[in-house]
Swiss-Prot record:
GO biological process: response to oxidative stress
Organism of provenance: Escherichia coli (strain K12)
Family, as annotated: To E.coli YmfS.
Name of protein: Uncharacterized protein YfdK
InterPro entries: Phage_T4_Gp38_tail_assem (IPR003458), TFA_Chaperone (IPR051220)
Superkingdom: Bacteria
One matching Pfam family: Caudo_TAP
């Protein structure tokens, strides 16, 4: 099967479907025919750390994956923050500390651990993700074996 490559869309198209793409108004104007070896190399998994781009000559090429933008780093930090909060809440809920505290049954080491975990949650809430990737994440309390 023969393929064409479009630098504009950074995509391959089967040449035998040109009529269908043309009728749909989606056949690229910059289509260049590529041999099977080029198609196989650039339609599969990219080498580690690379992405497919449109080369200067209109053919596909490999390029380094660009570093994440600041906005992407912030989004990743927000996700991590929420995951850490969820993990802490799950752990605390598994111990039923809130219920025990409400009825006065939380004492001693359990009370101390509960307060450490509440402090940890407070510290997580205060994390400013806008400074990503330079974030000092709070350390969770040591988990006490029971």
């Amino acid at each position: 099967m023969n393929y064409i490559y479009s630098a504009t869309t950074n995509s391959f198209y089967p040449l035998e479907m040109k009529e269908d793409y043309t009728q749909a108004g989606s056949w690229p104007d910059d289509a260049v025919e590529v041999d099977e070896q080029v198609y196989i190399e650039f339609s599969g998994l990219p080498p580690k750390g690379k992405i497919r781009i449109a080369g200067e000559n209109g053919f596909p090429a490999w390029s380094e994956i660009p570093p994440p933008t600041h906005e992407e780093q912030i989004a990743a930090a927000e996700l991590k923050k929420q995951q850490l909060i969820n993990q802490a809440n799950d752990y605390m809920n598994s111990k039923q500390w809130a219920g025990k505290a409400a009825i006065g049954r939380l004492k001693g080491e359990e009370l101390a651990q509960y307060n450490l975990w509440l402090d940890y949650l407070d510290a997580l809430e205060l994390v400013d993700t806008s400074s990503a990737p330079d974030i000092e994440w709070p350390t969770p309390p040591a988990v006490q074996a029971r």
